């Protein structure tokens, strides 16, 4: 009897030791994982496949990629071929692009939904929010309505080549600035700085998005004279560009939106920037991308800008779309944003809302089909 108990204890201890050993091995694998494994990892079974299959297919890379860091997903071998062996010459497929544009327009009237206009809302009208409970509302004030354009800022606009510039750290050292600035229209995301990074990201800006939370994060809600001056000077640099302000995504933006409205009314006529305030556009945009098997809690700003660009651009080139913490060309570590301070740790907070790797894979597939040019290598 005693021998049986001892045997059971020994068995349990053995299982515990094996589990600890596997955990230690996985941690070591994660730390020592070479970045090239991201590209050479074969297509393994789906997450629901038998665990032993994944061990057999390649324990180190699969365990580290699949279970320890969800931001790193196996990238297809075709990406390896294009970036590391023989960069292919991208060819624009106009027929496919026009077909996609038509598909998008069936779900989203981009011109109409690009911005609210004076004629599309009335004073006292209650606006709801795309990503908040229906109980939250924003009342259209006289000041807010006075800031709306008379017609959509992109009405009857057409541009040959457009650049949509994301904020990924892959732009660091890319020398893509001149190429971006040659575009006929440049979309930028989240009021990203350009001057100190112009060699990599360019200076030209025709449209930049402005999430109201930026006012809290970088301009202290305009609480001091210095904060207000800094914001004014930043806006002045935009000259006649469009400032696209998605004020109706979250109810938490309401107070900041009112602060913005007061500021723009106060400085009416002093700035050349064009204001655009989209209404509830996301329900339409989400519907299109859901048909492409992309349905995160929230789409990224970058893919939203691609959606808008499809309506006014004859050809779209993407820069700064890379959601991983290393450069695919040099394998050096990258910051999450190109403008992050040196030494800033790569963040994966976006996982709470976005599906950036899935978005990237879709965009890369579109690149291969000639729908859009996705720049991942250095430009010079």
Swiss-Prot record:
Give the highest taxon in the source lineage.
Eukaryota
InterPro entries this protein is in? Glyco_trans_29 (IPR001675), Glycosyltr_29_Sialyltrsf (IPR050943), GT29-like_sf (IPR038578), Sialyl_trans (IPR012163)
- Give the positions the UniProt entry annotates as the active site: 354 (proton donor/acceptor)
Q: Which GO terms describe its molecular function?
A: alpha-N-acetylneuraminate alpha-2,8-sialyltransferase activity; identical protein binding; sialyltransferase activity
Q: What is its EC number?
A: 2.4.3.-, 2.4.3.8
Organs and tissues of expression = Expressed in neurons in brain with higher expression in the striatum than in the hippocampus, cortex, and cerebellum (at protein level). Expressed in testes.
- Membrane topology, Lumenal segments: 34-380
- Coarsely, its chief localization is Golgi
Provide the family line: Belongs to the glycosyltransferase 29 family.
Subunit relationships: Homodimer.
Name of the protein described by the UniProt record: Alpha-N-acetylneuraminate alpha-2,8-sialyltransferase ST8SIA3
User: In which organism is this protein found?
Assistant: Mus musculus (Mouse)
Q: Which gene encodes it?
A: St8sia3
């Amino acid at each position: 009897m005693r021998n049986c108990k001892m045997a059971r204890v020994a068995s349990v201890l053995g299982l515990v030791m094996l589990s600890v050993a596997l955990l230690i091995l996985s941690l070591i694998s994660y730390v020592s994982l070479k970045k090239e494994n991201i590209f050479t990892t074969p297509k393994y079974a789906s997450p629901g496949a038998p665990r032993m299959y994944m061990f057999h297919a390649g324990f180190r890379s699969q365990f580290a990629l699949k279970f320890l860091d969800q931001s790193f997903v196996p990238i297809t071998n075709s990406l390896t071929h294009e970036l590391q062996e023989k960069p292919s010459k991208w060819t624009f497929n106009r027929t496919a692009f026009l077909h996609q544009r038509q598909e998008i327009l069936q779900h989203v009237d981009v011109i109409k939904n690009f911005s609210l206009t004076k004629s599309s809302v009335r004073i006292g009208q209650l606006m709801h929010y795309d990503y908040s409970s229906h109980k939250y509302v924003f009342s259209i004030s006289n000041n807010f309505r006075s800031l709306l354009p008379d017609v959509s800022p992109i009405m009857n606009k057409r541009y040959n080549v457009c650049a949509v510039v994301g904020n990924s750290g892959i732009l660091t050292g890319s020398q893509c600035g001149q190429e971006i600035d040659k575009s006929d229209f440049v979309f930028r995301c989240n009021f990203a700085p350009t001057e100190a990074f112009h060699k990599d990201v360019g200076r030209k800006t025709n449209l930049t998005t402005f999430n109201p939370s930026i006012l809290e994060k970088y301009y202290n809600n305009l609480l001091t004279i210095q904060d207000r001056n800094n914001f004014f000077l930043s806006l002045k640099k935009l000259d006649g560009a469009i400032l696209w302000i998605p004020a109706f995504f979250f109810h938490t933006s309401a107070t900041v939106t009112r602060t913005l409205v007061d500021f723009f009314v106060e400085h009416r006529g002093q700035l050349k920037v064009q204001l655009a305030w989209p209404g509830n556009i996301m329900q339409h945009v989400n519907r299109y991308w859901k048909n492409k098997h992309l349905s995160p809690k929230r789409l990224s700003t970058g893919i939203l800008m691609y959606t808008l660009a499809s309506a006014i651009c004859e050809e779209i080139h993407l820069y700064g779309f890379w959601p991983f913490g290393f450069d695919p060309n040099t394998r050096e570590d990258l910051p999450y944003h190109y403008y992050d301070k040196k030494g800033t740790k790569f963040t994966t907070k976006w996982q709470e809302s976005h599906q950036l790797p899935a978005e990237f894979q879709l965009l890369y597939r579109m690149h291969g089909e000639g729908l859009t040019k996705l720049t991942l290598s250095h430009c010079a």
